[in-house]
């Protein structure tokens, strides 16, 4: 227990010291190059602060949700071989149903329509 306390204290002190040194020694001198927008090495064609369509944001969020669904359902074939496969199938069905209902809701609200 004494060794554990020593190791935890040492790691905390080392982390605090490195964080403090980084805060004090950091060179925060913004200039025009650091504050200018960067577009693949070229000067920007227009203002980089223009708002973009919220539909792109919604499509990106939907993509992330369905990508997460795939990541959650990927181990499903191995999980079915466990002692209680019905519990696994119940959770998988629940995940798919929730995402399907969310997609239907988004579709009926017009979130996926591009033309107005």
Swiss-Prot record:
EC number: 7.1.1.2
Enzyme class: translocase
Keyword terms, alphabetized: Electron transport, Membrane, Mitochondrion, Mitochondrion inner membrane, NAD, Respiratory chain, Translocase, Transmembrane, Transmembrane helix, Transport, Ubiquinone
Pfam families: Oxidored_q4 (PF00507)
Catalysed reactions listed for this entry: a ubiquinone + NADH + 5 H(+)(in) = a ubiquinol + NAD(+) + 4 H(+)(out)
Protein's UniProt keywords contain Membrane: yes
Keyword Signal: no
Record field: transmembrane: 6-26, 56-76, 85-105
GO CC term (a single one): respiratory chain complex I
One Gene Ontology term from the biological process aspect of the record: mitochondrial electron transport, NADH to ubiquinone
Topology in the lipid bilayer: Multi-pass membrane protein
Subcellular location(s) per record: Mitochondrion inner membrane
Subcellular location, principal: mitochondrion
Gene Ontology MF terms: NADH dehydrogenase (ubiquinone) activity
Family (UniProt): Belongs to the complex I subunit 3 family.
Subunit: Core subunit of respiratory chain NADH dehydrogenase (Complex I) which is composed of 45 different subunits.
Job description of the protein: Core subunit of the mitochondrial membrane respiratory chain NADH dehydrogenase (Complex I) which catalyzes electron transfer from NADH through the respiratory chain, using ubiquinone as an electron acceptor. Essential for the catalytic activity of complex I.
Protein name: NADH-ubiquinone oxidoreductase chain 3
Organism encoding this protein: Gallus gallus (Chicken)
């Amino acid at each position: 227990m004494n060794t554990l306390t020593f190791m935890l204290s040492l790691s905390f002190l080392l982390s605090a010291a490195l964080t403090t040194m980084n805060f004090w020694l950091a060179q925060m001198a913004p200039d025009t190059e650091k504050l200018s927008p960067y577009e693949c090495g070229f000067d920007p064609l227009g203002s980089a602060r223009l708002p973009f369509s919220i539909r792109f944001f919604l499509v990106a969020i939907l993509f992330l949700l369905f990508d997460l669904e795939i990541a959650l359902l990927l181990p499903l074939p191995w999980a079915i071989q466990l002692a209680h496969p019905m519990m696994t199938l119940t959770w998988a069905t629940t995940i798919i149903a929730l995402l399907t209902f969310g997609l239907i809701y988004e579709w009926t609200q017009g979130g996926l329509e591009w033309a107005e």
